[in-house]
Amino acid sequence: MSDNSKTRVVVGMSGGVDSSVTALLLKEQGYDVIGIFMKNWDDTDENGVCTATEDYKDVVAVADQIGIPYYSVNFEKEYWDRVFEYFLAEYRAGRTPNPDVMCNKEIKFKAFLDYAMTLGADYVATGHYARVARDEDGTVHMLRGVDNGKDQTYFLSQLSQEQLQKTMFPLGHLKKPEVRKLAEEAGLSTAKKKDSTGICFIGEKNFKNFLSNYLPAQPGRMMTVDGRDMGEHAGLMYYTIGQRGGLGIGGQHGGDNAPWFVVGKDLSKNILYVGQGFYHDSLMSTSLEASQVHFTREMPEEFTLECTAKFRYRQPDSKVTVHVKGDKAEVIFAEPQRAITPGQAVVFYDGEECLGGGLIDNAYRDGQVCQYI
């Protein structure tokens, strides 16, 4: 059996059950483990709800239980500059961002990783549901977590080969109930703690109210694609492509009881387009353009790839053909896709392996750009 005691692993601990069990498993495997609590958002701000103080108490309790040193590190400035400013800029541009993807890329596997290296870390570890496989030549492949319902490779798709080489995902081979059971068997204080939901800096707070504190709302007209005025919208930033709720219109218009969905935006005219039917023509597209395209392993500057893709978290894979040129890609769908949303991540897979991904700029229907921004 290899001697892990000379290998230092710094664990990102959130105060939740997943990162608690991550630290526990590594400690049981004999590694030299240090726990780090990342404070990314100012919880004294009256506009944001964050349970950082309580979460840190949970980290302290677990670290004491399993016998590892721990520190709290403040990454609020890095988070604001690298994640939150991006989040606001995307909403200003009429897009729907995915801050979790950027948080992993810029904070958990950059700012945190850099800090861990100053502590003499050989690796960092997190409670993400993903796996890494290492080739003999040192190349690392990122694989889906075995728990399909919890697999988080979608959010990790922007990680680089260098970041992955320094990363461990001890929970990747486990399913969530198994993780909770391990926590209970070890008597960890976080064993029954509920999973966090929503974006970390908003917590359980009303998203609309939160966003309006940073971006002034600009109400405008809500219209059908054929020009019927359907009333007023509260501000384009509050709506995402394919959204059903919150429109304030029922099936009464024109006598058709089919539900209404957001089918488009016109940022220049401040118009929100709506249509009836889950598979409304305006929601369907046949290809997309992506930027900030990145692969977890070294790839040629220009190439074509047949693979599968996800366009949102927990969505079944879809067959695609990807034409890559630099950090941009055209992604052609084998079957038309619904509600491809600018700002969201498109993530590429080859079987179990997550190859990387990019950010969706535009969706196209038979060569014509969809009016999604």
UniProtKB/Swiss-Prot annotation:
CDD domains, per database record: MnmA_TRMU-like
Catalytic residue positions: C103 (nucleophile), C200 (cysteine persulfide intermediate)
Catalytic activity reported: S-sulfanyl-L-cysteinyl-[protein] + uridine(34) in tRNA + AH2 + ATP = 2-thiouridine(34) in tRNA + L-cysteinyl-[protein] + A + AMP + diphosphate + H(+)
Keywords from the named record: ATP-binding, Cytoplasm, Disulfide bond, Nucleotide-binding, RNA-binding, Transferase, tRNA processing, tRNA-binding
Biological processes, Gene Ontology terms: tRNA wobble position uridine thiolation
Residues annotated as site: Interaction with tRNA: H128, Q344
Ranges in a coiled coil: none
UniProt name for this protein: tRNA-specific 2-thiouridylase MnmA
Organism annotation: Streptococcus pneumoniae serotype 2 (strain D39 / NCTC 7466)
